[in-house]
From Swiss-Prot:
<feature type="binding site">
    <location>
        <position position="107"/>
    </location>
    <ligand>
        <name>[4Fe-4S] cluster</name>
    </ligand>
</feature>
<feature type="disulfide bond" description="(transient)">
    <location>
        <begin position="96"/>
        <end position="328"/>
    </location>
</feature>
<keyword id="KW-1015">Disulfide bond</keyword>
<dbReference type="InterPro" id="IPR048641">
    <property type="entry name" value="RlmN_N"/>
</dbReference>
<feature type="binding site">
    <location>
        <begin position="209"/>
        <end position="211"/>
    </location>
    <ligand>
        <name>S-adenosyl-L-methionine</name>
    </ligand>
</feature>
<dbReference type="GO" id="GO:0046872">
    <property type="term" value="F:metal ion binding"/>
</dbReference>
<keyword id="KW-0819">tRNA processing</keyword>
<dbReference type="GO" id="GO:0019843">
    <property type="term" value="F:rRNA binding"/>
</dbReference>
<dbReference type="InterPro" id="IPR013785">
    <property type="entry name" value="Aldolase_TIM"/>
</dbReference>
<dbReference type="GO" id="GO:0002935">
    <property type="term" value="F:tRNA (adenine(37)-C2)-methyltransferase activity"/>
</dbReference>
<comment type="similarity">
    <text>Belongs to the radical SAM superfamily. RlmN family.</text>
</comment>
<feature type="binding site">
    <location>
        <position position="110"/>
    </location>
    <ligand>
        <name>[4Fe-4S] cluster</name>
    </ligand>
</feature>
<keyword id="KW-0949">S-adenosyl-L-methionine</keyword>
<keyword id="KW-0479">Metal-binding</keyword>
<protein>
    <recommendedName>
        <fullName>Probable dual-specificity RNA methyltransferase RlmN</fullName>
        <ecNumber>2.1.1.192</ecNumber>
    </recommendedName>
</protein>
<dbReference type="InterPro" id="IPR027492">
    <property type="entry name" value="RNA_MTrfase_RlmN"/>
</dbReference>
<dbReference type="InterPro" id="IPR004383">
    <property type="entry name" value="rRNA_lsu_MTrfase_RlmN/Cfr"/>
</dbReference>
Length: 346
């Protein structure tokens, strides 16, 4: 049975006012069943129930962090599992969504990379994470105004489904997000970066998980990184900027004794010369079985200072949800202290 959420809002069943009602129930009210759509005639609800599946998830579990972040573990209808993270701030509500079950990139410092690749998520399974998280938090899906494609998976290797999901996120009759508040992260798929630049109707932001400025180190920590050299990635980033005019963010996880040497800061600054960019330095978040540890605060500061002295726009990103296994690099289907929650609650 097809999943309703896999459809573009313009292609939803029903017409006119009834279609508008259906979209409002799904994307504003966030209900998880057709039966809950009480202003639709009973016969119409039964017809929709017989033709479409509304809920992409069989079950959901949550792990709550002391800082308010929540890790959501989703069991899909085929039994596979993946995760998303909800991060409330004083001025905004942000969600980090997955685009795959597992990940083929195999970054050595990332727990998801150790899982390997399961399968691509469909557009509805990506969008459904937003709806389910909103239901779990007791808010309207439209209250989540910031979204990052930074969970499990490489979005540019699930290109069509990721772009289809992004179009639903931005659609005014669906979630109506601002393109300036949606960021797609990639390990550096040069062909995908250039392709993204040509998506004129999207305009979402780009973040590249670079993590090292030299080929030897990058291939050590990102085995699949050899598919695209750093030069190829940087060339694609420049092409992207030339087409879109948008700044590019570089993500850089700080690994003690691996990529935190000051000569690497200097080389990174050289790589970024002429590119309007921002560097996010991310202290590595610990997880069981990792061979890496985070750089010291002192070394992170020294690396930061070296970049800043070269005129690089740089910040240190403090991760949320570490105690819940929900921080960057920790997503691996671990669920200490989890509780089962209702999926798709209004």
């Amino acid at each position: 049975m097809p999943l309703l959420l896999d459809l573009h809002p313009d292609h939803y069943p029903l017409e006119g006012f009834r279609r508008k009602q259906l979209l409002e129930w799904v994307f504003v009210q966030g209900v998880g069943t057709f039966d809950a759509m009480t202003n639709l005639p009973a016969g119409l609800r039964a017809e929709l129930e017989s033709e479409y599946q509304l809920n992409p998830f069989r079950d959901i579990e949550t792990v709550r962090s002391h800082d308010g972040s929540v890790k959501y573990l989703f069991t899909l209808n085929d039994g596979r599992q993946m995760e998303a993270v909800y991060m409330p701030y004083l001025d905004r509500k942000t969600i980090c969504v997955s685009t795959m079950v597992g990940c083929p990139a195999r970054c050595a410092f990332c727990a998801t990379g150790k899982m390997g690749f399961g399968r691509n998520l469909t557009p509805g399974e990506i969008v459904g994470q937003v709806l389910a998280v909103a239901g779990g938090e007791g808010i309207s899906p439209r209250e989540i105004r910031n979204l990052v494609f930074m969970g499990m998976g490489e979005a540019l290797l699930n290109y069509e489904n990721s772009m289809a999901a992004a179009r639903v996120l931005l659609h005014p009759d669906a979630l109506g997000m601002s393109k300036r508040r949606v960021t797609l992260s990639t390990v550096g798929i040069a062909k995908g970066i250039r392709r993204l630049a040509e998506e004129d109707d999207l305009g979402i932001k780009l973040a590249i998980s670079l993590h090292a400025p030299d080929e030897e180190t990058r291939q050590q920590i990102i085995p699949t990184g050899a598919a695209n050299s750093i030069e190829e990635i940087m060339a694609a980033a420049r092409d992207y900027q030339a087409v879109t005019g948008r700044r590019v963010t570089m993500e850089y996880t700080m690994l003690r004794g691996v990529n935190d040497h000051l000569w690497q800061a200097e080389l990174l600054a050289d790589r970024l010369d002429g590119l309007v960019s921002h560097v996010n330095l991310i202290p590595m978040n610990p997880w069981d079985g990792s061979d890496f540890v985070s750089s010291s605060e002192e070394q992170i500061q020294a690396f930061y200072d070296a970049l800043q002295d070269r005129g690089v726009d740089v910040s240190v990103r403090r991760s949320r949800g570490k105690d819940a296994g929900a921080a960057c690099g920790q997503l691996a289907l671990r669920r200490p202290g989890a509780r089962t929650g209702e999926v798709g609650a209004a």
